[in-house]
Amino acid sequence: LKAGDRSAKHIHPDLQDLFFVLEGEIEITIDGKKNRCTKEDFIFVEHLKSYELHALTDVRMLAMGCVIETQRTKLYPMLFEPNLHTKVWGSIDLTAWKELPRQNHIGESWEVSGIPNSPSVIANGTWAGYTLNEVIRKMPEAMLGKTVAQQHNNQLPILVKFIDTDDDLSVQVHPDDAMAHRMHSQHGKTEMWYVINAQPESYIYAGFKEQLTPEEYARKVADGTIMDALAKHEVHAGDVFYLPAGRIHAIGKGVLLAEVQQTSDITYRIYDYGRPGLDGKPRELHTELAAQALDFTVHQNYRNTYKDTMDMANLCLDTDHFSVRVLPLNYPMRRNMILYDSFVIITCVHSSCLIHIRSTQDEIELQEGFSCFIPAAIADYDIIPIMGDVKVLEAYINNRPRTTWQRIVSQFMHLSGYDI
């Protein structure tokens, strides 16, 4: 290495490294700890540890690696068994789109889930048959990222699902973290919708269009006129809506969308058109809890704007709970996400692609209508379209320090290696 040379951050899930300095001086940073090494010093880097090299002078080194691949440490992009949920407003269409055996009344497909009563089950590789939660418990930092594991108590903090509507959904709201912890000992539920397909004149409701007091809200719920106070949005493929906890919302019929949300299944149903459930009984309403959870703030625009540029990783949402990028690709793209210290969930919404892991050479095919989980320790990968263009979503936790200007600049810039 020449003086001043720096390497990118590396993590080897199945390899232990030994560096022996023959000549010169080098700084080797292991999991954030800097180690200064000179002639005849050696340093050992365990598997699953991140390291960076910085040559302080011209340096000659001997580097050795030992492959230690075992079942316990094997990491790769994970696919999942179908996790389908019956809904009164569901139909056969979602299973048809995913080319699964046809089932009626299917409204949701939980693509990557850590919800305890409905976790994702791994379908491929070493860990096939295990739940995602079980593997995370075995290797929390390698799977989630060190920061994510520490901040979220070794639990997957987001859920990705598909929703397909054959009828209007109930009008509902979700609590924020404070209320959810207080009332249910769970996380709150902030979410984002990405519209994959919508029939002509389909719509969603998001937010209020007029300012209401809690008393006015209660009256409108009681007399069945609450719909008149909601902001109604006609939707088209590619539309994005951010729904922070507390924002009233509903999806109309004829919409297929991907939802990224916090790991929570708490819903307060406000209005359900007087419709019975699949059991023939009226579905429960939660008007009092909803009144406590609601944010009555009126906004001018509830639709997210973002650039949908071909062959770019377009940032459409960046929040403390999760970040999401939209990637329409004609050509292969490298995605080095190691610096985020986070897992990545890739969801294919159009066509199909290969996901190729650079450190392990593992490769999977990701088809339209399916998702994969990339562990944090191997989040340096290529997305390779198979035939024509492909469109995928990336969901992850942004753990990089973010100043105000970085948040603004990141809306417009993309680097094919490390991202802002």
Regions found by a protein language model. Name each.
Residues H47-Q71, I163-D168, D177, H187, ...:
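Ligand-binding loop in jelly-roll beta-barrel domains
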Residues K220-R269:
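Loop-centered beta-sheet repeat module
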Residues G32-L48, L230-Y242, I357-I378:
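Short acidic-glycine-tyrosine-enriched beta hairpin
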